[in-house]
């Protein structure tokens, strides 16, 4: 069945079509939630909320661009919405050195290690990091997203 037909059936609340869309895209979308979340449990909550939003708004997809890109944007916006109303970034008042030297061999850094470091950042810092470094948004765009 074509993706366009699946999308239209999802808009009509066809459960089989929704299940097929879920099976096609759940892996990629969960990885997005994982990178924006503190831990796996929070990622699962964000993932579930994101898919609910996708299926609620799927009728708004206009077939002008990539459906996968649209779903990624909905998923990221769902996660960001949860964090927008949280406390603002705390400004660090202690002296911060101009340069920090870290001596780590590139071969020693694993993907799990990096993911763990990112997940341990405070919520808003993690959001900014992901949006800037991983998704390529400008600081101006990020500022608008987080307002």
Model-found features: residue ranges?
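Sigma70-family region 2
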Residues: 11-12, 48-66, 85-86
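Internal acidic/polar
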Residues: 81, 88-111, 116
């Amino acid at each position: 069945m074509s993706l366009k037909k699946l999308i239209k059936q999802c808009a009509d609340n066809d459960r089989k079509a929704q299940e097929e869309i879920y099976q096609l895209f759940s892996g990629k979308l969960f990885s997005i939630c994982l990178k924006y979340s503190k831990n796996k449990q929070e990622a699962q909550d964000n993932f579930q909320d994101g898919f609910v939003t996708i299926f609620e708004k799927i009728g708004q997809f206009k077939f002008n661009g990539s459906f996968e890109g649209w779903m990624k944007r909905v998923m990221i916006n769902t996660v960001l919405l949860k964090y927008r109303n949280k406390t603002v970034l705390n400004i660090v008042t202690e002296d911060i050195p101009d340069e920090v030297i870290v001596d780590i061999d590139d071969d020693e850094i694993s993907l799990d290690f990096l993911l763990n470091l990112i997940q341990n950042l405070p919520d808003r810092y993690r959001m900014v990091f992901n949006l800037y470094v991983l998704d390529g948004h400008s600081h101006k765009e990020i500022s608008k997203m987080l307002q």
